[in-house]
């Protein structure tokens, strides 16, 4: 539930189903604007927070709804190459990418801070030129203090998911912040059992025992050949692979669930 007397206000871009929002609300923040174009994600977001996000953030009519005076901009934007990238790459060189829209909103609204997330491959994308351009825009064109980005794994902070992401934070020059240390791992060990739905799960989320055995056999054959195979079969005392959108095999986490049969997996995850 939103905080009545918030410590700060933030906006949530590329919101997905609301991971950023949940985290910032838990430390006293109030979300004053949300954007997410995917219709299915919008439905889940509404179920989680009671409101539907605005749509495509590249549209000027969407940007017009962003209020003034918020403190923090959050954005988990996708990794895209720039036509001109590297040390000389500037604000206009990023036009046509979703990072340009993020940077444009920062430039217009001048938030006290921003909190950006991307896949860890951003560090090496286009031989490092993409990240170099992003940092050049944030530091030199927009004037924010931006410490070197850091790759953080969610499993080191009490989340039962092996999810490595790169984080970029920045602070408005008026704050006179010159140093920033990323948090150190909390060593809070969490497993899937800590987040699994407590209520009975609908049978449509389950696979048949026969199909599961087929996957297990297929996975074993691939492993014997030295190949990886996307499906991971997880028990209550384990952690999941990174949970991402998409339908490819490497993105599936099958969880053994003993509530219906002794050997039946489910992909039902709290908040999904």
Explain the meaning of each model-derived region:
Residues 9-11:
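Conserved beta-strand elements of the Class I
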Residues 14-17:
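Class I SAM-dependent methyltransferase "Motif I" SAM/SAH-binding loop
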Residues 23-30:
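A short, Lys/Arg-enriched amphipathic alpha-helix followed by its capping loop at the start of a domain
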Residues 34-35:
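The conserved SAM/SAH-binding core of class I Rossmann-like methyltransferase domains
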Residues 38:
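Conserved SAM/SAH-binding beta-strand->alpha-helix loop
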Residues 43-65:
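S-adenosyl-L-methionine
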Residues 62-70, 80-252, 256-267:
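Class I S-adenosyl-L-methionine
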């Amino acid at each position: 539930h939103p905080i009545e007397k918030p410590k700060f206000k933030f906006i949530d871009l590329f919101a997905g189903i609301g991971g950023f929002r949940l985290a910032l609300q838990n430390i006293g923040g109030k979300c004053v604007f949300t954007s997410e174009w995917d219709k299915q994600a919008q439905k889940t977001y509404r179920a989680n927070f009671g409101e539907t996000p605005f749509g495509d953030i590249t549209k000027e009519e969407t940007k017009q709804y962003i209020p003034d005076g918020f403190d923090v901009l959050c954005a988990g934007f996708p990794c895209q190459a720039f036509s001109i990238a590297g040390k000389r790459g500037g604000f206009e060189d990023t036009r046509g990418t979703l990072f340009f829209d993020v940077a444009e909103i920062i430039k217009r609204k001048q938030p006290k801070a921003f909190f950006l997330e991307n896949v860890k491959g951003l560090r090496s994308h286009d031989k490092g030129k993409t990240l170099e351009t992003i940092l050049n825009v944030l530091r030199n064109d927009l004037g924010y203090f931006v410490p070197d980005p850091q790759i953080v794994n969610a499993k080191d902070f009490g989340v039962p998911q092996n999810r490595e992401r790169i984080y970029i934070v920045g602070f408005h020059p008026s704050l006179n912040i010159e140093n920033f240390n990323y948090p150190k791992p909390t060593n809070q060990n969490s497993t899937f059992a800590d987040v699994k739905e407590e209520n009975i799960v609908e049978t449509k989320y389950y696979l048949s025992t026969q199909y599961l055995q087929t996957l297990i056999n297929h996975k074993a054959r691939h492993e014997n050949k030295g190949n990886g195979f996307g499906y991971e079969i997880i028990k209550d005392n384990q952690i999941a692979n990174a949970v991402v959108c998409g339908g490819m095999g490497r993105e599936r986490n099958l969880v053994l669930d003993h509530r219906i049969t002794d050997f039946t997996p489910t992909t039902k995850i709290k908040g999904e």
